[in-house]
UniProtKB/Swiss-Prot annotation:
It holds the Pfam family RXLR. The keyword Nucleotide-binding does not apply. Residues 1-22 form the signal peptide. Belongs to the RxLR effector family. The RxLR-dEER motif acts to carry the protein into the host cell cytoplasm through binding to cell surface phosphatidylinositol-3-phosphate. The KVTF motif (residues 138 to 141) is required for the interaction with the PP1c family proteins PP1c-1, PP1c-2 and PP1c-3. Effector that interacts with isoforms of host protein phosphatase type 1c (PP1c), mimicking a regulatory subunit and causing their re-localization within the host nucleus. The holoenzymes formed with PP1c isoforms act to promote late blight by attenuating jasmonic acid (JA)- and salicylic acid (SA)-mediated transcriptional responses of the host plant. The gene is PexRD24. Its main location: secreted. This is RxLR effector protein PexRD24. A motif (PP1c-binding motif) lies at residue 138. The keyword ATP-binding does not apply. Induction: Expression is up-regulated during the biotrophic phase of infection on potato plants. It is found in: Secreted; Host nucleus, Host nucleoplasm; Host nucleus, Host nucleolus.
Length: 154
């Protein structure tokens, strides 16, 4: 009982701060809040959501590069992958969500060894290499590798 009174008090305070003058429930179950300016808060929120959606739809390659600064293909993470085998194997697991073409494009010929390692070791070994990601010295392969992908001089 005491916690529901606190909750109700918090709701009333929130409504007062936002100048809400009336609260009504519509037939579809949504709650509409009328403000002193006469505009429904629900309509305003819907309008703001559509603006955000339209901004999100106009993304450029610059936006994508900014995300990559903190993402899977950030230069700092790629350098760390070159130094740490266990970190590299964890990141390879996250690369499975992308196509090989996309990964190759993101690496931009700066990290060809990572791509070759991803294709020749991680993809060929499957779950066996993931099982030993914390101790890469214990990795064993049960299947023979049937094909290798090599970098060319072109």
């Amino acid at each position: 009982m005491h916690s529901s009174l606190l909750w109700l008090g918090a709701v009333v305070a929130l409504l007062a701060v936002n100048n809400v003058t009336a609260v009504s429930t519509e037939a579809n179950g949504q709650v509409a809040l009328s403000t002193s300016k006469g505009q429904l808060a629900g309509e305003r929120a819907e309008e703001e959501n559509s603006i955000v959606r339209s901004l999100r739809a106009v993304e450029t390659s610059e936006d994508e590069e900014e995300r990559d600064l903190l993402g899977l293909f950030a230069k700092s993470k790629l350098k760390k992958m070159m130094k740490s085998e266990s970190f590299k194997l964890k990141r390879f697991g996250e690369w499975d969500d992308f196509t090989v073409g996309y990964i190759r494009e993101k690496l931009k010929n700066k990290y060809p060894d990572l791509l070759l390692n991803y294709l020749n070791v991680y993809k060929k070994a499957g779950n066996e290499i993931v099982r030993h990601a914390n101790n890469p010295n214990k990795v064993t392969f049960s299947n023979k590798v049937r094909a290798r992908i090599y970098k060319t001089n072109s």
